[in-house]
Amino acid sequence: MSGPAVRRETGHFFAFCLDTLRGLGRRPVQVREFVQQAWFISSVSILPAALVSIPFGAVIALQLGSLVRQLGAQSFTGAASVLAVVREAGPIVTALVIAGAGGSAICADLGSRRIREELDAMQVLGIDPIHRLVVPRVLASMLVAVLLNGLVSVVGVSGGYLFNVVMQGGTPGAYLASFQALGQLPDLLVGEVKALLFGAAAALIASYKGMTAKGGPKGVGDAVNQSVVLTFMALFALNFVVTAVYFQVVPQKGS
């Protein structure tokens, strides 16, 4: 894709995001569609997210436990492991699962509607496809991402705690005490904010690629692949920005 085409596509995407933002305040609210999409996204995301979060938490605990022992700071294993899961691993795992499972399904659904000309028919009938289809999916993805991030964080921290205590001989009291000493409420909030933003980004990219799909069934498949890849890239870039802003704005305990 050439430079002008990339800029044009980026402009169209941001215009699409603005249209979706305007649609958030419009009535009537598509409650039925929202509930259906929230249930669908959660049903395809809960089990994979829970299963992935266990090894994530375990690997983080094992790696950090080994590192802090080499540095002579074994008492801080709990703080390092829990903060890594809550701030970074939890939202990232949540976003990747939602983008891979829920986002691909959203893109495929809207892409199929596009090639069957259902979206054009809705516009002819005076129905805004963005308000009717995109807004409920974005809101559902945001809600599920926030709730799922809580589950992933709990499972990941529990897995890290278990592996640290059982496999590395850590002390349960020291594991929890170090987190209490260095952790703070904004650490939990930033994880939820990340999950909220990641869920919105995943749904917006998937919806945009689906609604602009063309070329028949093959085009829909290509749009799904592109949406997943673009979402992963956007999530890591967004994670860097949010993390950088967080460390600049929120003073850290013990610093």
Which residues does each predicted region cover?
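Short cytoplasmic-facing helical segments at TM-TM junctions of multi-pass membrane proteins
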Residues: 110-135, 217-220
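Generic alpha-helical transmembrane segments of integral inner-membrane proteins
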Residues: 51-58, 142, 146, 150, ...
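Active-site cofactor/substrate anionic-group-binding motifs, chiefly glycine-
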Residues: 39-93, 97
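Hydrophobic alpha-helical transmembrane segments of multi-pass membrane transport proteins
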Residues: 77-120, 205
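Short hydrophobic alpha-helical segments within the ABC transporter permease transmembrane module
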Residues: 81, 85, 125, 129-143, ...
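Membrane-interfacial helix-loop-helix connectors in multipass membrane proteins
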Residues: 63-87, 153-196, 205-224, 245-255
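Short, membrane-interfacial amphipathic segments enriched in basic
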Residues: 2-32, 209-214
